[in-house]
Amino acid sequence: MIICNFMNICMIDPNDVYKWFMEFSLDSYDWVMINNVYSMGLFADGGLTTTKPYITSSNYVLKMSNIKKDGYWNVVWDTLYYNFIYHNYDKFKGRGKIYLSQWDRQRKKQEILKLAPKIMNRL
């Protein structure tokens, strides 16, 4: 889910994500990957099977792993996270209200919107 989460906040095309997962794993099957990638991982089915997208800030990664905060990867991750919320703001109305409030409270909006395209172009 973390890899799919990162691909989602990078706004990688869902079909490319699906293809990557199918080629990455020896035991990947359509009946598993279609739901895992398009529904749970990317919310690309428009909410048919999930109520909101599974996206997280770097805080979740820090809590669920032994990765340390270093001021680089977590800034990149959080920039992409908030950029994703900004670009999908209207889609979150009625579904992902927590994401809306996080964006609304964000103090570095202009900095994020300026930095995100630079990060995405380097990926």
UniProtKB/Swiss-Prot annotation:
Lineage: superkingdom: Viruses
Coiled-coil region(s): none
The protein's name: Uncharacterized protein R855
UniProt source species: Acanthamoeba polyphaga mimivirus (APMV)
